């Protein structure tokens, strides 16, 4: 997992500068899909959640499709971690995608206590799981 230049404050300011009060988080298996900015705020807002992972994907991305079953399996294996996904083409979340500096797919962003702590960019399930274990400690 890499720590990069994404600033938690930039992400939070992006959320704060919206008037979206709608919550539409949809749960598929043990991974919840974030659809609105309010969903994103809700996902990160509870600092007691511990580790939160967000998978940025698109429906046409081959590597995203390949790792999706592994991501679901990891969500079931690590129940103390909160697993989410965001379609990077969702226009409602374009500001979040930009603030998180998503330039390659899939990208998994890691947050702890509401703060950005790093990312894993690859469709490698072994590497992703290693990053989850390391970030959980």
Swiss-Prot record:
Pfam families: Thioredoxin
Residues at the site labelled Deprotonates C-terminal active site Cys: 55
Site (Contributes to redox potential value): 62-63
Domain Thioredoxin: from-to ranges: 2-137
Disulfide bonds: 61-64
Active site feature: 61 (nucleophile), 64 (nucleophile)
Superkingdom field: Viruses
Keyword list, A-Z: Disulfide bond, Electron transport, Redox-active center, Transport
UniProt cross-references to Gene3D superfamilies, sorted A to Z: Glutaredoxin
InterPro entries, per database record: Thioredoxin-like_sf, Thioredoxin_CS, Thioredoxin_domain
Function: Participates in various redox reactions through the reversible oxidation of its active center dithiol to a disulfide and catalyzes dithiol-disulfide exchange reactions.
PANTHER family to which the protein is assigned, alphabetical: THIOREDOXIN-LIKE PROTEIN 1 (PTHR46115)
Family that this chain belongs to: Belongs to the thioredoxin family.
Protein name: Thioredoxin-like protein R548
Species for this entry: Acanthamoeba polyphaga mimivirus (APMV)
């Amino acid at each position: 997992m890499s720590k990069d230049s994404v600033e938690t404050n930039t992400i939070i300011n992006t959320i704060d500068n919206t008037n979206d009060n709608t919550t539409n988080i949809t749960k598929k298996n043990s991974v919840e899909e974030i659809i609105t900015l309010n969903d994103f705020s809700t996902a990160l807002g509870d600092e007691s959640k511990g580790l939160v992972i967000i998978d940025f994907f698109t429906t046409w991305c081959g590597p995203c499709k390949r790792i999706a079953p592994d991501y679901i399996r990891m969500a079931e294996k690590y129940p103390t971690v909160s697993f989410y996904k965001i379609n990077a083409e969702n226009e409602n979340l374009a500001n979040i995608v930009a603030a998180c500096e998503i330039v390659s797919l899939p990208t998994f962003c890691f947050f702890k206590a509401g703060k950005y702590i790093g990312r894993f960019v690859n469709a490698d399930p072994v590497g992703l799981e290693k990053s989850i274990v390391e970030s959980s400690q």
